[in-house]
Amino acid sequence: MSGWIATSKTRMQDFWSLLTFSSDLVDVKDSGDYPLTAPGLSWKKFQGSFCEFVGTLVCRCQYILLHDDFPMDNLISLLTGFSDSQVCAFCHTSTLAAMKLMTSLVRVALQLSLHEDINQRQYEAERNKGPGQRAPERLESLLEKHKELH
């Protein structure tokens, strides 16, 4: 996990360095040349790393932060605020981040749905076994898992 944190911190620093140069970006606004569309390997790498960061953030935090309204509300507010910006770089970067965030959230929801289906089938299969073959502990653990998933 510490490797992921270090990599994420680097990616987040790249993102924040982009946002802190707002005065430079205002001048760039009219030219249309900003980090997400800028030529060069380093900017292409930034775009890929930025998209990967958002997806990885959601994936790694799916059991913790996604169930807490405070961080998600603030992240959505931040992205919404930047998407309303007159600075194209802020607007487009936050829109891209919002799209990646939503895509990642849909993936998490799909995984949860698949886990629910598998759990339900396992529970039904165990319940349909004969009284001598049925494992009460297994039924109980599957029922607890079912409650966790809902």
Curated annotation (Swiss-Prot):
Belongs to the SCC3 family. It comes from the Eukaryota. Disulfide bonds: none annotated. This is Putative STAG3-like protein 4. It holds the Pfam family STAG.
